[in-house]
Amino acid sequence: MITTTARATKTVLIVDDDQAIVRLLKEALGLFRHQHAYKIETAGDGADALAALHRDQFDLVLLDMYMPRMTGLELLAQMRHLKLQTPVLMLTGNDDTRTAADALASGIFAYIPKPFDLQHLEHLVSLAVSSRSTPASR
């Protein structure tokens, strides 16, 4: 599903099998007060996200760790294999430090345990999309 605001300047892929989290993230992105507006695409698992990444370019991926068909870490490995430089914020209910270290070693921008603070998420989203030197480049 794709949602676009009238002045969308950045494209975000939300990957999570929990539709309540997807709705929360979509709503939050619409409320953030920094200079960007977002075109949002969603995927319910890593396999659908991989198809979206083949089809489109994104400025940011918000990624759940544990999903059916392909985990977040498996998707990250595929993204790196494709040489995608898209910043990834990994959102997870797992607060295990080893898992966080593995995710960070995979090249994610930030590891965010659930439940997360929306102000903290807003700050990280702003930093991540601003870290790109060119819009939606591979």
Task: Describe the role of every protein-language-model region.
Residues 116-126:
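C-terminal output helix
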